[in-house]
Amino acid sequence: MYEAFFGLREKPFALTPNTDFLVQLAPYQACLNLLRVALGEGEGFIKITGEVGTGKTLLCRALLNLLDSEQYQLAYLPNPSLTPLDLRQAVARELHVEGIEQLDSMGLLDALNRRLIELAAAGRSVVLLIDEAQALPEETLEALRLLTNLETERSKLLQVVLFGQPELDAILERNEFRQLRQRITFSYRLRPLDETDANRYLQERLAVAGFRGDQPFGKAAVRMLVRGSGGIPRLLNILAHKSLMVAFGEGRRLVDKRHV
């Protein structure tokens, strides 16, 4: 609606996790660097947490794009509301294990072990990425722990990255998950953006969408956007989009605080 008015090719603040719009802010870069180094060293089990809307899914997608497909075999589970059998089937499917429908739970575990050994022999590290991991049922978390038992004398056959909301931390703190918790080698918590990062976030997303020129959001508008969103990128997107619409409706190319 307002794209042509502001000289944009597309909407800059859409809510879909498009990695073209991943802004290279320090918190995101630190998280991606941690993931790349830890996975490169075969460090096994990594947990990334953050509030709803802080960019976990976008980072997960970015990691999928960054990792070398010749070095890594990736398995991505966007919907973890799975039974233990469903989990093994989903991982087996991602790793191209054949005939999984005919296998029971133990048969699947054996088939997965063989496939993981085969991939390791070919020099490929297997990484399982689970988004919205706080939704994993308790029995499936235990099944995940058993999957991480698969190893050779030298290395783990399966590395795991969990992306989840803060509830995941609370779940893993429970006594029944202490063995799984002890396997986590690295953790990272995504924080809300401060005003400086939020301003850069707005500018870079506008630039990716085709905007050229001075920042259309005035300083007071940026402060209002940060305050209203709490620095949460998803909420920042929603408010920025609505503010552009209001300014467009008034025929104004500068968004000030009354538009927010």
Where are these regions (language model features)?
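A short beta-strand-to-loop transition that corresponds to the Sensor-1 phosphate-sensing loop
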Residues: 51-52, 132, 162-167
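Walker A/P-loop nucleotide-binding motif
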Residues: 42-63, 80
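Central P-loop NTPase core of STAND/AAA+ ATPases
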Residues: 95-120
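Conserved NTP-binding/hydrolysis module of P-loop NTPases
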Residues: 8-13, 71-74, 82-101
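A short, basic N-terminal segment
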Residues: 1-42
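Helix-loop-helix "sensor" segment of P-loop NTPases
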Residues: 97-98, 118-122, 127, 152, ...
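Conserved Walker B catalytic segment
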Residues: 113-162, 175
